Amino acid sequence: MAETSTNDTTRPVTRRAFLKHSAFLGGSAVAASQLEGLRSLLARAEASELLPHGRYALAKAESQIHSVCIQCNTGCGIKAKILNGICVKIDGNPYSPWTLSPHLPYATSPFESALVDGTLCPKGQAGIQSAYDPYRLIKVLKRAGPRGGNRWRTISFGQAIDEIVNGGYLFRDVAGEEQRDVQGLKDLYALRDPKVAKAMAEAAKHIEHEKEPTKKRALVEEFKANFKDHLHTLIDPDHPDLGPKNNQFCFVHGRVKGGRGEFIKDRFTKDAFGSVNAHGHTTVCQGSLYFTGKAMSEQWDYDEKDKKAKWTGGKKFYWQADTGGSEFLLFVGASPFEANYGPPLRAGKITNGLVEGRLKIAVVDPRLSKTAAKAWKWIPAKPGTEGAFALGMIRWIIEQKRFDARYLANANKAAAKEDGEPTWTNAVWLVKVEKDGQPGTFLRAADIGLEAKIAKTAKDGTAYDDDSFVTLQAGRPVAFDPNDEARPVHGELLVDTEVTGVKVKSALQLLWESASEHTIEEWAAICGITSQDIIDLAREFTSHGKRAAADIHRGVSQHTNGFYSVFAWYA
């Protein structure tokens, strides 16, 4: 075996190696300041002298600070342990249900809770690295060279505020930009009268909605005449829909937590500055997941703002599986053992379920994740084909009649209540089929003369008209109110017929037809897997009643087809 010298001083040091070791040494400066204290702890541990706990500084309440982890968006409660003013250890907060199950009662004394640690994932543990990273930005950096030149200099916070607000010749020292006059926020803060801004916005909305070119041009000229004293505040007076120059200020953020978001996005950007442009991370994260949840949670009800019955009340949220009570969990593009919302909360419950034999899990993910390594079955479907996988399962489940027919037959709230169900679906609601064969809107009782529109009065005293939906019972159309709590209505599931000359299909029929556009073999080919993979998961998924769930946060949504893929899985 050849000998390798450890004292080779002639080998050149690469830039990458230099930066890596420099970062290590920089971060080590903090650790070095605590080295003696850590050595003392180790020495006492080896000598078994750490007990009783009063001699162990990190187990004292005064050495601990309770906070929230922001290493990811879960926001687990944490307990930071401080030694001589430096954070040396982070554990889970025992008061938090995210990190300890069952969590300590809030009435527990901090002197007692100091001895109890919750769990925390490696991301949370790495909070120390984030806090003391030598490359952490703690000052404002200003570009000191051409764009892309990676040259920066630090400036004071006060100077940054002044330059951002007032603009000016901010890059006099950069070649080619000596005469570049940069606009500041004061230059973009053009339209300042809220009453005028509201009136202009309403007028611009009419222009935007008008599609006929001649009428549109006439509305633009009318707008310019009505607001002639304020045209200088617009981005382009000939295109009022672009809005005021205020809209040229864009607040583009990654993730902003509650409180900060309401202030920065709403109160400052929109309300105070008057810009409509506050934009988050959208589908690159999980925007499709949120907006599918919003679309699917919309209910037909009276809308207090618009003073009429409409689809309303949808929330930007998503569903996740009950890891503590399920018998079968299907994780699609999700790995709670290393990410997700969040390992401290979910990983322990899943692990207990697997160890106790209560739970079986399967994973659909192109990557063999930590979660997939513990799964009954891992299916490496191609990225972006998750919707095809869901439709393949849907086709098999409907054709094999392995769905909860009684639950799906509930057309309204009263029917669900009668069956002891907390929710109901639109599976049996009839949908009108257009002349081109495509589904249109839901059939209403007034469409077929079943009953007239119903005059109702809202809680705020507003009178409005409502129109009942329709389902089939024993082949006969029946009108119903989805929110009716007194008269239960159950409908037929798979419907493809005509009602008084109107071609209709049930919502479940349309779902089955969509899933039947391809054979299971064809769906599998799209995913790059076998048809048996789809069948095996569909069979297992339908073998546990209501104790089976699919968890799709968030890989399914992170594609351009994310909205529709999430829709397929939620269906």
What are these regions (language model features)?
Residues 322-325, 329-332, 511-527:
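Conserved thiamine diphosphate
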Residues 369-374, 513-518, 546-552:
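Short acidic (Asp/Glu) and glycine-rich catalytic loops that position anionic groups and cofactors
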Residues 2-483, 489, 530, 569:
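N-terminal export/assembly segments and adjacent metallocofactor-ligating motifs
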Residues 487, 495, 499, 503:
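Ligand/cofactor-recognition surfaces for anionic moieties
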Residues 243-245, 279-283, 503, 521, ...:
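A glycine-rich, hydrophobic/aromatic-adjacent loop/helix-cap motif
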Residues 151, 178-187, 498, 505, ...:
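Conserved alpha/beta enzyme-core scaffolds, especially Rossmann-like or related mixed alpha/beta domains
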Residues 322, 360, 367, 385, ...:
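Secondary-structure capping and boundary motifs in well-ordered enzyme cores
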